[in-house]
Amino acid sequence: LKCNKLIPLAYKTCPAGKNLCYKMFMVAAPKVPVKRGCIDACPKNSLLVKYVCCNTDRCN
């Protein structure tokens, strides 16, 4: 699986066991991602932070 990184057009290949891509952003600024990468399980959203996870190449 390949996931986008925060830098535009950059991506990385996920290590074994991390089979989800995620995008994290602040609830107050939903159009501006704060963090992107590979993850093993989708974290829960909170009042301040929202996570979007997916499982296809570079879907984040």
Curated annotation (Swiss-Prot):
GO annotations under biological process? Answer: killing of cells of another organism
Tell me which GO cellular component terms the UniProt record holds. Answer: extracellular region; membrane; other organism cell membrane
Q: Name one Pfam family in it.
A: Toxin_cobra-type
Is this entry keyworded Signal? Answer: no
UniProt subunit comment: Monomer in solution; Homodimer and oligomer in the presence of negatively charged lipids forming a pore with a size ranging between 20 and 30 Angstroms.
The record's function comment reads: Shows cytolytic activity on many different cells by forming pore in lipid membranes. In vivo, increases heart rate or kills the animal by cardiac arrest. In addition, it binds to heparin with high affinity, interacts with Kv channel-interacting protein 1 (KCNIP1) in a calcium-independent manner, and binds to integrin alpha-V/beta-3 (ITGAV/ITGB3) with moderate affinity.
Put simply, this protein is called Cytotoxin 5
Q: Which organism is it from?
A: Naja kaouthia
